[in-house]
Amino acid sequence: AYASMTLDNDPMQQEYLLRVAEEDFAFAMEKFKKDGFDQFVQPYEHSYNTSKSQYMATISWSASQLYKLTGKPSYADIAAEYIRYTLDCQRTEPLKDKDGTRGFFYRDKSRKSIVHYIHQSREQVYMQAMVMLCETQKEHPDYPKWVNSIQLYGDYLKGMMKYTHPYGMIPSGVYHAEEYKDTTNFYALHLFPPANAKELYTEQIK
């Protein structure tokens, strides 16, 4: 979909890419409705790290791109519907730390584990989805929620920059001291962990 939006000097290729994008999206949505998030079985698979909140943001972002390309209301509806899960995973109330930190995302609605960022760089998908929604559906009733999400996340990132000063790098995120208790997410994040993974995690967090 993104390629179709950017290749404006080749109408034939643009049309082909749009058709493929719609077909791929339809296939992916059909499988998702059938299997949900499914279970991964491939060893060394780094996509284990992707959280449910990120998957839902990705669905929304993809649908928004197709809506921008085609103008079909069905894509707009999907984009607005699936981002609601992601919004429910964002921390909007301040933590009880000295900075009142908020704005980050949890991996799922249970809010047991926080999204941390690794070298694969998937963190941008949350804001890509929110921004595309704001650009394509300005009259939607949820528009203020999307804007608020962007503002909260921006404040969160800016608030953390002091911890990496003067290097100008974004930290991987805040951590919950007892995330190891969320065993499903903990062992999906850390492939082939040692027997004392809980102790090692606790030591690093301290």
Task: Name the predicted role of every residue range.
Residues 1-206:
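Glycan-recognition and catalytic cores of secretory/periplasmic carbohydrate-active enzymes
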